[in-house]
Amino acid sequence: MEMTVEKTTPILEPMAQLNIGATFKIVPPPDGPARGHLSARDPVTGAKKWEVTYKQPPLASVLATAGNLVFVPDSEGIVHAYNADTGEELWSRNNGMGHNAGIISYMAGGKQYVAVPAGWGSLVADEFVALYGEPFKSMPKNTGALIVFSLRQ
């Protein structure tokens, strides 16, 4: 990513607008296209236990549960559930829209749920179209859904 810091005057009328005081552009790394990965590390030694790679960088947060699961919502719209010890993919679902927000887990009525915000639209989303084309070019922008799954006990 290339970033230029600029002093700008915030736009306040007719309503406040985002002003981060910088412009940025995502550019591919010099050694090839940008990719993403999730790696699990031993917390004591730092040794890599396992790694999963993605065609594009996932933009959403990662969720680890006490039940030994790791959830990763990827940029293409697929939610992956992995075994935290081995990295084996246990489950996945295509939500039809990219993910770029936080995933959470909660308990209600004695049952555990995972809630995944889905939708495509942000400063970064526009840059993904320029870098990767499809499927991001065809994704509806500024849409959203909250998709909730229950976990088996």
Describe every region a protein language model picked out.
Residues 5-59, 63-153:
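Extracytoplasmic/lumenal domain signature
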